[in-house]
């Protein structure tokens, strides 16, 4: 690829993707950021930087890696797609459905690759679980539970978590959006979801203006039922999935095993994205997948407000 790759947003995940692309051998980048990041600039001194999106897109990037706050994703994605740039869109794809269908139509018309950053689809054990389920090793699925609790102030050492997008409603924060991975990998593993019921809490302990815990009940179209628990409170952190089938169970715990680097997931998803562009492959996690997960989250939020079970549209 001779055209540059645009990194739109230079927070912690933008820096990770930049490092990983460099590790994969790519050297031609453009950086678009507002200058509000508190990360040091030493790694980007050699990268042309624009503070205006139109100027950044004037460099004609072959791909745009969208890593700015959730509430700003869609405006950048639409502009980049109009410019003919393939998209790697961090999760969640947005905080509302505004502009989402426009992006879907635009990407289809321009034949653009759009991959969504749900990196757990690249976890070797979750991929093994998917194979086991496809082989019907535990029979029909009866119930599935996912639990993800992680203390928000510990996420990025040296940063004020109050200022992060995860903690701010206007930037698309809160556990339902920020920790939405289980909704994606449950769809991927178990199948489509029919209806959602949710409750949430703003406990006040973290002094943030978004929900810091939530529980979501899911009815799958297959007849299976599920539960997702998310929180910003739990210490030590815990993340697992427990699947009950008619003939057995599967339990996966995300506690770090020996000799496993979680950055492998991010390397593999970025390698896959580049391969999709250069070899015309289809993304393992497509824009349609990202839209489906966003609908689940927004339906959960609606359920909280209306205090009832709601069918997905």
Language model: regions and residue ranges:
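N-terminal Rossmann-like dinucleotide-binding module
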Residues: 1-44, 59
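Hydrophobic residues in well-ordered beta-strands that form the structural core
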Residues: 89-90, 114-116, 252
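Beta-loop-alpha module in the N-terminal Rossmann-like domain of NAD(P)-dependent dehydrogenases
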Residues: 47-106
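A short helix->loop->beta-strand "cap" motif at the edges of active sites that frequently abuts
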Residues: 26-27, 83-85, 110-113, 224
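Contiguous beta-strand/loop segments that form the cofactor/metal-binding neighborhood of enzyme cores
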Residues: 177-256, 267-280
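Rossmann-fold dehydrogenase core element
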Residues: 102-120, 140-144
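Predominantly a Rossmann-like dinucleotide-binding segment in NAD(P)-dependent oxidoreductases
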Residues: 120-207, 307
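C-terminal helix-rich "cap/oligomerization" subdomain common to oxidoreductases
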Residues: 63-66, 135, 221, 275-313
């Amino acid at each position: 690829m001779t055209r540059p790759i645009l990194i739109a947003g230079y927070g912690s995940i933008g820096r990770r993707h930049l490092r990983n692309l460099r590790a994969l051998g790519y050297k031609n980048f453009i950086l678009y950021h507002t200058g509000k990041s508190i990360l040091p600039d030493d790694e980007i001194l050699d990268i042309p930087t624009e503070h205006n999106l139109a100027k950044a897109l004037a460099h004609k990037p072959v791909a745009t890696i969208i890593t700015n706050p959730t509430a700003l994703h869609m405006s950048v994605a639409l502009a980049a797609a109009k410019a003919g740039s393939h998209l790697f869109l961090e999760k969640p794809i947005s905080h509302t459905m505004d502009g989402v269908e426009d992006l879907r139509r635009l990407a289809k018309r321009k034949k653009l690759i759009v991959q969504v950053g749900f990196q757990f689809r690249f976890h070797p054990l979750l991929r093994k679980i998917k194979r086991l389920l496809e082989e019907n090793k535990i029979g029909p699925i009866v119930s599935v539970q996912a639990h993800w609790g992680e203390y928000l102030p510990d996420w990025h050492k040296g940063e004020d978590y109050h200022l992060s997008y995860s903690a701010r409603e206007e930037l698309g924060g809160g556990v339902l959006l920020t920790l939405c991975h289980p909704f994606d990998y449950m769809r991927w593993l178990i199948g489509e979801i029919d209806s959602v019921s949710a409750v949430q809490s703003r406990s006040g302990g973290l002094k943030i203006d978004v929900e810091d815990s939530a529980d979501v009940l899911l009815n799958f179209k297959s007849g299976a039922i599920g539960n997702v628990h998310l929180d910003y409170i739990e210490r030590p952190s815990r993340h697992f999935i427990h699947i009950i089938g008619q003939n057995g169970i599967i339990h996966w715990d995300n506690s770090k095993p020996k000799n496993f680097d979680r950055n492998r997931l991010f390397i593999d998803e970025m390698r896959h994205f580049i391969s999709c562009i250069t070899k015309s492959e289809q993304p393992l996690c497509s824009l349609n997948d990202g839209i489906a997960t966003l609908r689940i989250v927004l339906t959960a939020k609606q359920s909280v407000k209306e205090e009832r079970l709601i069918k997905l549209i």
